[in-house]
């Protein structure tokens, strides 16, 4: 005899999965995971944040503007991420996130002090600010990890010199 699953149960399961899939996915760790800059607090404390260089990246449907960023090691930056699109976008660069010491991430929900960034999701119409000091030189891939966004060209590169 075949198993019958009530339609309400299937609908509830689908709606729950959809809600979880659409939930904001900004991921930060309070302690640096392996591979991340480890001595963040003294590095960010040693910087004059009044001298932070402002950089703005606009996120919209399938592009970062600009999509190529260059930073200098040891220089403080205030990176403003403006989502001007109609859907959420991520600013994700695992290598870059491992190469910087983050002082603070500020979202409309408030600041998070000295986080280790894993993924930044910026909902439509939202602006997030990341204050950081680049530590390790290199060139790192940048992508939006929302479904198909990188396939449609929402990619870039970040260079630390």
Cite the ranges covered by each PLM segment.
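Bacterial N-terminal signal peptides that target proteins for export
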Residues: 2-11
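C-terminal motif of bacterial Sec signal peptides marking the signal peptidase cleavage site
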Residues: 18-21
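Extracellular/periplasmic metallocenter environments
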Residues: 23-38, 63, 114-161
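N-terminal edge beta-strand
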Residues: 42-77
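Beta-strand cores of secreted/periplasmic/IMS beta-sandwich domains, seen most often
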Residues: 67-92, 127-136, 160
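Short, compositionally biased
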Residues: 93-99, 146
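Short aromatic-acidic-glycine turn motif
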Residues: 97-108
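Short beta-strand and strand-turn-strand segments in soluble, beta-rich domains
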Residues: 107-115
């Amino acid at each position: 005899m075949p198993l019958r699953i009530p339609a309400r149960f299937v609908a509830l399961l689908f709606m729950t999965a959809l809600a979880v899939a659409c939930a904001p996915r900004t991921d930060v760790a309070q302690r640096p995971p392996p591979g991340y800059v480890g001595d963040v607090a003294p590095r960010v404390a040693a910087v004059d944040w009044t001298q932070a260089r402002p950089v703005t990246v606009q996120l919209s449907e399938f592009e970062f503007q600009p999509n190529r960023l260059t930073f200098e090691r040891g220089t403080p930056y205030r990176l403003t991420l403006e989502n001007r699109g109609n859907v959420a976008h991520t600013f994700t660069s695992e290598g870059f996130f491992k190469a910087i010491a983050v002082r603070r991430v500020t979202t409309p929900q408030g600041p998070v002090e000295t986080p280790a960034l894993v993924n930044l999701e910026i909902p439509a119409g939202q602006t997030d600010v990341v204050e950081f000091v680049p530590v390790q030189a290199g060139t790192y891939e940048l992508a939006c990890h929302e479904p198909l966004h990188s396939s449609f060209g929402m990619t870039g590169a970040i260079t630390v010199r």
